[in-house]
Amino acid sequence: LSSLVALTADDPQFQPGFEDADTSVVAAVPIYGRYDWVSARGSGRKEFISFLQKFVTKTPIVQHHQLYVDASPLYRVRADAPPFFILHGRDDSIIPVQEGREFADALRDVSTAPVVYAEIPHAQHAFDFYYGSPRAHYTAQAVEEFLSWVAATARRRAD
């Protein structure tokens, strides 16, 4: 969801009743995200779309295809995207790591802001929930350093 928020800033489709509000974000840090809600190709994709149809959108993709496109960060990459730090566990069995790689590549192809991608070795989905683990600790530290860099860069530009 953080990717979708970052890539739909000021999009009136997603802010009914407050279309004039600034909904931009300074940076995005998606972790093990699902960036493509449309493609049925690849490991776990058909099951994911079935899950979306039954529990999330509650509408069939064949009848409401645009809804799925609109909810897919992969189809919303844009030149003015904020800086991104994309993290994905290399051993994620719920969302294959390839999806993170493809999203990072697509975003790098168009964005003028930095796009950082990190694959966490031997990490499963939700690897960051194990707060006592070294993997979670170092990942949190890397996120903090990235966000501090974004903030410092923004301050320098403002001066």
Residues of each region from the PLM?
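Conserved alpha/beta-hydrolase "acid-adjacent" motif
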Residues: 93-102
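Mobile cap/lid helix-loop segments that gate and shape the active-site cleft of serine hydrolases
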Residues: 7-8, 39-76
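Catalytic histidine-centered segment of alpha/beta-hydrolase-like enzymes
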Residues: 123-136
